[in-house]
């Protein structure tokens, strides 16, 4: 069949009038115009005046994290740099601290709410990173939350291990040791 548009072709959007979409087992099986094919036991949904599109894929999320950093927006709007925000106790390290303190249940509940909201906007698949634990037990905790959500939520999740998001505060004086930890301890335990 035809493949997806690439390059400049992506900008050529095609609208079909009097179109139909046949979905079998949750997957688009065929699309056409004119008379709707007769399929035994099919449910017909009148989508006139609506957009029909495949599920959206969010290919870059930081879904699993503790705390909130909304106060940093005000700081940014007042001209503060990331380094100034970090030195004031914000930035990724503040999220790391909150993520480490959060329970599996807290992380899962927060992420599930975000997934529900994303589904409401048409997203059906997300890539979800670890990367705010920055210690073996906490990175594995985040990946376990992602796995559990993938097993029990309607959203499809694809996990990405991001244990080297940054060098955490406790390793600032010994970056090489943190790289060793990621390579020799964390990565072998990621499944």
Task: List the model feature ranges, each with a label.
Residues 18, 41, 49:
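Phosphate-coordination loops involved in phosphoryl transfer and adenosine-cofactor binding
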Residues 42-46, 159:
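Conserved beta-strand scaffold positions in the cores of enzyme catalytic domains, especially
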